């Protein structure tokens, strides 16, 4: 009877973890697979072959002499000195809405995020102002760099997303800009 109870508890834990994992992966920030016209357009791309995109040039995924497993282990558990600054990064917040539209300007927000204002058009590129990851302990911004929010943005003419990695496409920022 004790063995059966232990089995039920273990099975319950496994089922709970599985359900939690599936629910986690179905967050809107993970996006969804393309379908319909979008999928057909993707399939017509010259780099799309055999169900996936192929790089024109060979891309080396592991650039060290380590095995994949030891590389992952090292990435997760190795202590790297100087990886994060000890002090907040100095930053000056610009009043973006007050920049005259006639004035050409470039405001860099960090990493790949910037606002380009040229010829009376405003182009926002890769905005990440909320969270660059669906989990709070990954991709934390450096202290001092999180000074802008989507509410600080002026009216945008064009929104450019270079690719769909979390550090270039912040779901919550894009939803708030909408």
Question: What is the role of each PLM region?
Answer:
Residues 3-133, 138-140:
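Metallo-beta-lactamase
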Residues 44-45, 137-178:
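Active-site metal-binding motif and surrounding structural segment of the metallo-beta-lactamase
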């Amino acid at each position: 009877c004790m063995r059966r109870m232990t089995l039920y508890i273990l099975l319950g834990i496994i089922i709970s973890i599985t359900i939690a994992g599936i629910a986690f992966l179905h967050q809107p920030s993970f996006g969804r697979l393309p379908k319909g016209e979008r999928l057909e357009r993707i399939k017509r791309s010259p780099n799309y072959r055999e169900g996936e995109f192929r790089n024109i040039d060979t891309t080396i995924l592991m650039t060290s002499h380590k095995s994949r497993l030891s590389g992952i282990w090292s990435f997760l558990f190795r202590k790297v000195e100087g990886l994060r600054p000890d002090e907040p990064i100095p930053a000056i917040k610009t009043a973006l809405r007050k920049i005259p539209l006639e004035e050409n300007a470039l405001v860099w927000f960090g990493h790949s995020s910037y606002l380009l204002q040229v010829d009376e058009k405003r182009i926002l590129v890769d905005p990440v102002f909320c969270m660059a990851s669906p989990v709070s302990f990954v991709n934390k911004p450096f202290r001092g760099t999180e000074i802008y929010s989507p509410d600080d943005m002026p009216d945008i003419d064009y929104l450019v997303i270079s690719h769909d990695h979390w550090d270039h496409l912040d779901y919550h920022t894009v939803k708030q800009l909408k």
